[in-house]
């Protein structure tokens, strides 16, 4: 007997699907236009290599995100009409699917909610001219108010956020363009700090940051694919919403940070908000407020997805209660400053979902480019592949020498290939359980 999350699953009919430019492309582009993507991008990239190297990294990273992390999940969604937690039951099993990708997606969404709450709070306080520092009373008060409000909207009124999400996504794009023109004059004067010059590190860190940021969204390509009409929608939605969006949403901030440092040699820090502060005046304050407002969809959707993941995989848990409980954890991570370290969080996300995407890709290809169907019990081929890939993905956190750590990035990419290869080998060795029938 199948669990409820499979027994009650109904494929999305073709009549409810839409073209790529109405759903997939703008939704994915909105993910990359979120401030969390590029806030700390420059500090680990253009400090080690020139803009040409970093732009090459953006191009390659965007194509890798599209081809490796998005395409197979999206095609599975297109062909089945089912969301990620259903199609994942092939790679991880009917019982195994509870945890991966089901509950794991919910847990990581709490982390994303914390990130969204942290930066919205930080930018609101900076816009008000108030000292912004985690673990202080103003930061805690603003973080709790923002987090609780967004969690409630995510639990009870997500449909209203969906209606304005595309409009709000246009705000950061406009801000990126304005900041670029404000700083463009200094781009030619930017020079990589001589003591840190290492193009290899610049290129690999660009890949690591982009792929780590995208990993969960790539697996969620299943949910976008189930809303696509055909393979062309899947391809164009990914190429425009992912590959092109990475270049625009990553490239403009890199140019802006480089330009700001070229024009102001005394500028401290390579975070994107350092550039906004350097612009100064009412313009900077307005920008901080607008970036915070543009974080509304991300905060609400993270809360909604987390609650939905928990309530779907554990039906006895009410969705609103699980949403608010997850939000409470996220708020704590935000106001204490834990959520401020984006690069480390991206690495964890890449380590968690890189091998999931890799194992799913192997399963898809071994099954003749189709969904095999749910597999009985736990698919240990999937779990072992994930564990091996996760270990590879967290290598940057292990006590390795600085020289070795130079070569462990992009760990998220290596974790994908580890998951792919290990799953393929174990599947060939007969470790995949038998397929069980879905209800008609």
Describe these PLM feature segments:
Residues 18-35, 180-186, 194-258, 281-300, ...:
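Hydrophobic, membrane-embedded alpha-helices of multi-pass small-molecule transporters
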